[in-house]
Amino acid sequence: GGCLRGEEVRVGRVGPSGAGKWAVMRLIATITTPTAGTFRWNGTDIVGRPVAMRRTLGYLPQDFGVYPELTAEEFLHYMAALKGVPGGAARPRIDTLLETARLEEARGRRLGGFSGGMIQRVGIACALLNDPDLLVADEPTVGLDPEERARFRALLTDLAEERVVLLSTHIVSDVEATASRLAIMHDGRLAATAAPEALIDRVRDRVWEWVVGHDELGRVRDAYRVTKATRGPGGVRVHAVAKQPPSAEATPAEPTLEDAYLSLLSGPTSPR
């Protein structure tokens, strides 16, 4: 079990594929019902009252489909009608959301010509039509190029100023750039929940860098939790997590969130 307090407005749920993130997101979105236990939002048991949750929820699924023949503005009006947003309120709300999602210049373009990043921003606009208190985004940056991913991260950070944003991803850099608190899942269970800085502190003084020969890299990967390897003319500079210096030439390195994440997933191993 766990609890998200009011000040924790940007929560990243991260874990490898198959960790259980998708199942949890579907429970939160009231798409599926838990077989046991309770799930509360602001004190209300949403298992027994899913409609109450849906009124305050905005959900962006991993596979967000659109009608390619519609323009962005037409599609948002269509979705607003499905969500029961009154006609008089829909137009100004859509105008605001097109600006928020940085789509105002593309409002009259057909969705069939949009890039993947633009489609995801249309998805965010749809999720915000009912002005939700909780925005849930499931793997929203998968398939986006680096520029679109950075733009989408910035959008999520801006949106978290007024609501709780729950981001599920297996891409550590996504949560590193957007989340004020992380919930790490592994094998269907919550392995840790903490601020990114606290997770990084767990591996401080256990991160090392040293240079190995090109033919030694495989052995080093087998022996240590290597999070980065940079090839050069003089060998491979290895960045790894280990309790003790892996080599006489190893020097302490600044830990990263990826170091903390991968170390946590690997569990207590030796010599890692």
Give the ranges of each region predicted by the language model:
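Hydrophobic anchor residue at the start of the ABC signature
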Residues: 124
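Catalytic Walker B motif of ABC-type/P-loop ATPase nucleotide-binding domains
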Residues: 135-138, 144
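Conserved ABC ATPase "signature" region
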Residues: 77, 81, 88-106
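Helix-to-loop junction immediately C-terminal to a conserved catalytic motif
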Residues: 29
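ABC transporter nucleotide-binding domain
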Residues: 152-239
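Conserved ABC transporter NBD signature motif
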Residues: 37-45, 53
